[in-house]
Amino acid sequence: MNGWMGKIIRINLSEGRHFLESLDPLMARNFIGGRGLASKILFDEIDPAVDPISPENKLIFATGPLTGAGAAASRFMVVTKGYLTGAIACSNSGGNFGPELKFAGYDLIIFEGKAKEPVYLLIEDDHIEIRPASFLWGKVIPETVGLIKQELKESLGKTDWEAREFRVACIGPAGENLSRIAAVVTDDERHAARSGVGAVMGSKNLKAVVVKGSQSINIDKHDQLKNTLFLLWEKLKEAKSTGYNLPTYGTSAGVSFYNECGIMPTHNFKYGVFDHAAKINGEEMKKKIVKGSFGCFSCPIRCGKITEVKEEGKVWKGMGPEYETLALMGASCEVDDLAAIAKANYLCDEFGVDTISAGGTIACAMELSERDYLPEEDIGFKLTFGDGEALVKLVEMICKNEGFGKVLAEGGYRLAEKYGHPEFFMGVKKQEFPGYDPRGVKGMGVAYATSNRGACHLRGLTSLSELVGIPEKVDPLTCEGKALLAINFQNFASVIDSSGMCIFAFRGIWQDGTMEALLNAVTGVGFDSAEMLKAGERIWNLERLFNLKAGLTKKTDTLPKRLLEEPSPRGPAKGHVVELDKMLIEYYELRGWDQDGVPTEEKISELGL
Amino acid sequence: MPRVKIDSNKCTGCRSCEAICSLEHFQVVNPLKSRIRIYHEPGQRLYIPIISGPFTGAQCTNKTVKVIGGVEIDGCVLCPVASCPSRHLFVEPGSEIPLKCDMCGEPPDPMCVKSCASGALTLVEVEKYATDFERSY
C-alpha cells in the first residue's frame, strides 16, 4: 500500500502478547485512516456503554495516510472512550511520534485489556516488546523520557544517536492517578490532551509507547506530491496567519485578535472581552518569554514556541502557553500575569494534564467560590478571580493529586455538580470549552453543542470563516446558514484529522483541491472531492452512533444556560445570546437525522455504515 | 561554487528537509534515507542540521567537543563527513550504502533549501569548498 503502511499492531496487555494484522484497503479508503479508521475499529470492537477505565475499553493510537508523508502532516490520534466525557474521544497530537510510528511500519496500535504491572511498549521495526515500567511509574514526563533513553542506552546497547531517535508517547502522574483531565504527551513536545485519554492509558497500566523505525512511507506519485507541496508551502507562506502570525507568535497571536472580536472567554465566560489581554498577548509573550520556535515533523508553519520563565533560584523551561491556555487559564480566570500562566502551563506539561480543561475547571471553581457556593475551607485558601498565585497552586494540586486538587482533577462538570450549581460549568458533554465565546461567533455555538467529543475547537472551527474569512467571511452574529457552515467544517475536519494533516494547514487546503491532490499523490487511491467529504460525513455519523449507543442523547447537544440566556454584557457581541434551538433543528435536518438527533436508516445506509 | 549554508539558530527541528530529501532521491519518505539530518538535544531544544559529505573508511583521532548555545556537543556529531566507523549515520538502511549530498537540482537548487521555511538552510556561493569552520552555528 502507498501512504498507509498496511499493518496494525494489536497488543493484549492482560496476556502480554501482541498480534499483527493487515489493514483492509477498502476500510482504509472508506475511513481514510487515523481518527476515522480508529473510530470504526472502536465502534466495531467495544460496547459503547463500557466503563472507560475498565479493561474492556480499548485505546487506539492511529496515524493517517499523510502522517509523516511530508505535507505539514505529523498528527497521530489517540482514540478511545473518553474518561472525561463518556463519549468517543479522539485527541490529536503533532510532534514526531506519529511519523516515527509509520517509519516503524505500522498505521495503528490497538491496546486491549489491562497490564498487571506498569509496562511500556517498545517498538523498533519488527521488534515489539512489552517491558516493565515500574521504574517509570510516578515520574514526570521529562524524567520519564530521560529514563527511557537511558535504559535504551544502558540495557539495550543503543548508541547516543540511536537513543535520540526513539520517540516516546507517555503519560505523567496525572494519567496514573486517573485524573479525568489527563493527557498523553509525546517527547515533552506535543500533547494529545483532551477528553481524559491519559487516564484511559493509565488505567491500562501503560506508561509509555517508545518507537523507532527504518521503513519508508511509499508514495504513489512522488512528482505530483512534490509539486503539490511546493504550492502548499507557497500558499501557507503567503497567508498572513500561517506565513507570519503563527511562525512569529505561535497560537498566542490569537489573543489580541479574538479579544477584539469580543469572543475572549473572560470571568468564566461571563464577558467576551478581557481588559488585560494586552498583558498576555502574542507580542507580550514574544517580548518576555519566547526563546525560539519548534516545528512538528515536516511542517513549515512551526507554531510551537519554546519559552522560558526565570524566577529566583529557578528557571522554568517549556513550550507554550498556547492560545487556548492563555484564554482559559488567563482570561477565563482573569489572570493577567503571563509568568503565572506559563508556570501553570509548564506544570500541566510536566505532569500530563490538559491545560484547557484545567483552566476551565479552575475558572469554574473561582466563580463558585466568589458566589460562596464553594466553602473556603474545602480549598484551603481564599480563591478569587485574577489570582495568579492561586492558579499555579491549584494546578500544582491537580497535578500532584493533593487536597482540593483531587476534586478539580475530576473536571469542571463534576466540580459544579458536587457543589450543586451545574450551571456554572462551561462546557459541553462534560468537557470544558476552549477559548471562543460562542455568543460572539454563533457558528461555534452549534459546532460546540453537536461536537462528538464534547466542547472542542478542532471539530468545527467555524470561527475561521466567521471571523478570519476562510474560505469566505460571513457575519459572526447571525444564525443564518451557521448549521450548514458547522456541518461543512465538521466533515472537512474529520477528513483532515483522519488523514494526519494538521488543522492549521487548513488555510492552504480548504476547498481548492489541494487536500484531494495530496491524498491522491500519496495513496494513489483516486479520491475526488465528493468521496472525500462523504468519508468525512461517514466518520462524523459513526462517532454520533457510538455516542448514542453510549447513552448520550439530544439533551447533551446543548450549551450552558449562561450562553443561551445571559446576553453578553459588552464588546462587539453585546446583547447577544446563542439561539441554539433554531440552529440545532436546522442542523439535524441538514445532517439527515431525525428530530432527536438520531441518524435515520436512509442516512446510515447511504453512508454504508 | 554553490553550497548550503547552515544557521542552526534558525532551525526549528521540523525535518521538512529530511522528508523532501528522501522523497527527491528515493521517491519515498524515510529520514534514514535522507542526506540531511537534524540533530536535536531534547531537554535543550537545540536543533542542528547536518549535511552528509563524502564517506570515509577510517576514524579520525582528533575528537573534539563543541559548545553550542551553552550545550556541549560531541564533535563527531557535527562532522561534515558522511559515515565513518564512529558514526553510523547517512547509511541507507538495508543496503548499507553510504549516502552523500549531491546538491540536487540543475543548476544546484537543493530540495532541502527549498523546503526550509525557517531560513536555517540557504544556498550561498563560496570560492572554495566550505569546511567546518566556515559554517556558522
Explain the meaning of each model-derived region.
Chain A
Residues 1-92, 96-609:
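Intrinsically disordered, low-complexity segments enriched in small residues
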